[in-house]
Amino acid sequence: MTIEVSNESGIDVSEEELISVARFVIGKMDVNPAAELSMLLLDTAAMADLHMRWMDLPGPTDVMSFPMDELEPGGRPDAPEPGPSMLGDIVLCPEFAAKQAADAGHTLGQELALLTVHGVLHLLGYDHAEPDEEKEMFALQRELLEEWVADQVQAYHQDRQSQKDQRLLDKSRYFDELNHGDTP
């Protein structure tokens, strides 16, 4: 799976985190591992221009998705076997997202993770124009985001444990060297 991120927003964000959440969602949705995704981060002026050009709506927005191929998520019972493809582009506006994050009481990173999940789901054909579609998409979005966060927490704890184990191992080697008369 190839995920490219281009940050033209002027705001420092964790590209690794964006790639991580996108890769997680794409994997959970059974998209072919050879799929490609492009993510672009823009400032509010560039996002407002894109929003007007493609959606005919004034002002910036948080996320826009531009699917390249007609795809259905592989996890859906009515979906055909997934094949390699270009999923499309997700465009994020960190400056706009920062305002939303502050209003929601969480970090910009958390907001961008949410918007990345939202953008990937749009690329896979999910929408929220109708109430039943919104209910389905937002429930799936919440579930995927919670699973990704849990996965990140578990990885963090495993990494911390590995660091502790390595320190103990290093100490035991030091004591082994002392007991055998070797100098460290």
Curated annotation (Swiss-Prot):
Enzyme class at the top of the EC tree: hydrolase
Skewed-composition ranges (Basic and acidic residues): 157-184
Residue positions binding Zn(2+): 118, 122, 128
Protein's UniProt name: Endoribonuclease YbeY
InterPro entries in UniProt: MetalPrtase_cat_dom_sf_prd, YbeY, YbeY_CS
Keyword Protein transport (UniProt): no
Role this protein plays: Single strand-specific metallo-endoribonuclease involved in late-stage 70S ribosome quality control and in maturation of the 3' terminus of the 16S rRNA.
Record localization: Cytoplasm
Predominant localisation class: cytoplasm
Essential cofactor(s): Zn(2+)
Renumbered residue ranges of the record's region Disordered: 156-184
